[in-house]
Swiss-Prot record:
Classification via Gene3D superfamilies: 1.10.8.60, ClpX chaperone, C4-type zinc finger domain, P-loop containing nucleotide triphosphate hydrolases
Compositionally biased tracts (Basic and acidic residues): 109-127
Top-level taxonomic group: Bacteria
Record organism: Polynucleobacter necessarius subsp. necessarius (strain STIR1)
One GO MF term: ATP-dependent protein folding chaperone
Homology family: Belongs to the ClpX chaperone family.
Protein name: ATP-dependent Clp protease ATP-binding subunit ClpX
Amino acid sequence: MSDTNNTNSSDKVLFCSFCGKSQYEVKKLIASPSVFICDECIDLCTDIIQEEINKLPREDSDDSLPTPHQIRKNLDQYVIGQDHAKKTLAVAVYNHYKRLQYLPKPKKEKLDKDGKPVEGSDKKESKLPAKAMVDDVELAKSNILLIGPTGSGKTLLAQTLARMLDVPFVMADATTLTEAGYVGEDVENIIQKLLQACDYNVEKAQRGIVYIDEIDKISRKSDNPSITRDVSGEGVQQALLKLVEGTMASVPPQGGRKHPNQDFLQVDTTNILFICGGAFDGLEKVIQQRTAKTGIGFNATVPGKDDRGVSDLLIEVEPEDLIKFGLIPELIGRLPVVATLAQLDEEALIQILTEPKNALVKQYQALLTMEGSELEVRREALSAIAKKAIARKTGARGLRSILEGSLMDVMYDLPSLKNVQKVIIDESSIADGGKPLLVYKQKVDHADLSKKA
């Protein structure tokens, strides 16, 4: 506390004991028995403490990491079927995060009294990617490639894994990526989105999961080299190589345009788990050609009709099939774990409608409960919804649009009808486009919306 005028106690001007600003230069000045602190210094101290907390390494124990059986059990609650893919993902994710427990703990940087790094400390060593070592054996990272038809659950599997492990998760669309310098998103933007997902906490981001969807859409257009540059196909694959394998990516800090003089954030992608997914439409034909029996002369066999389905063929996928499809060998080598998803049949689609925690029927039942009504979807209607989704070849994604279409008129009129007790969807509501049946509270009277005029 300073006193600018000692003649009169009422003329005393109070100063912050930390920054020296007067009470007229700050919004608030908090007093203690002997010192004062302003609101600006309080905010600064809060930020410093929060940064120190974020820098503390997270202590992982064996109990905190779920076993493959536990991971599989959690996936079963949200994803129906796909047993082979679940088992493959559970083992790969468990091994990946088990590997992270053996990473060397970061050394604390020596700072002087002003909070600046002490000269002479080895800065180059801190920028090298951290490697997991067990008994002098380096544990390499195993990224994952998901192959399956559209609507089979690839994205949902990745989202459920990230939610269970409580790690930063980001989805990227490969179709929007281009080489650096061209119109579109650079591959480094993926890491920037991951940082945004964890509030720019670099330590958390370096343990996150990145899901790159539609990876099959950046395949090479042809096997023959072209004169023109393929900036959205093979060029993107080349740009993804170092990012997927592990490199120090330079990402602009939060509010980069507002603070152009700030240094770029260095993010080590060595320990980020990359999951790439795609439908790979037409890959089954490549596999079919490779596995077809051939011969010469009298030993030649007439190729008959292959009765194997898409799911059976995709299980037999080999790296050479992916290369022929259009992925470059270097990228395939960096995605060693390949999990194939089966095409969903009618019974699986019915289970998806009713069994998971966030099943579609349960969601619409909750919506109608808000209006004071119940929703009943009969077994025949569930079967009709599944058959229509199979005919549209949209997989589980098509279920919502079909159910939404059948309930559109009901959800439009229901807020105005206060005496509806139950809404019933039967087979005719789906197959023939009929109106759902309404059961009123006053008397049991089945009436459809067409009678309301």
